[in-house]
Amino acid sequence: MGTVYFTRAVLPEMIKNHYGKIINVASVAGVYGNANMVHYSATKGAVISMTKALAKEVSAQGICVNSVSPGSVSPAENRDMDYFEDSQLSFMGRTGTANENANLICFLASEEANYISGQNIQIDGCRKKQ
């Protein structure tokens, strides 16, 4: 619900200014669904659906709404250590990094991404569908 509450809080000012960027963080679990993670998968899927629906409502007012769905990410404290099991989920053979996710979010927040809205962008190293 935090995504909904935060959006409600910032949207009026964005509408008033005819400009804004909303970038939600979902997960590949919301795209594919993960076994034994039904609640997590469902809520992340809801974030993706909310992103697409809200973009249709506010894009004409200069507001871009997108979501990012990371795959497996190695913790910063283990930057040099890749988790073998998680790395097997990607055709790239490794997990992602926090910086790779942050770079995508920074791009979506930039003016270079002013024509991108209503998208869920997976950053998952070409994840193998389960």
Question: Where are the regions a protein language model picked out?
Answer:
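A glycine/serine/threonine-rich, flexible loop-to-helix segment
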Residues: 60, 67-90, 130
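A short helix-coil junction within the Rossmann-fold of NAD(P)-dependent oxidoreductases
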Residues: 9-21
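Alpha-helical segment proximal to the catalytic Tyr-Lys
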Residues: 12, 56-60, 114
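A conserved structural motif in NAD(P)-dependent oxidoreductases
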Residues: 90-101, 112
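Active-site helix of classical SDR
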Residues: 7, 43, 51
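Active-site loop-to-helix junction immediately N-terminal to the catalytic Tyr of the SDR YXXXK motif
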Residues: 33-41, 53
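Short C-terminal tail/terminal secondary-structure segment
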Residues: 32, 106, 117-130
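Residue(s) in the substrate-gating loop at a strand-loop-helix junction
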Residues: 27
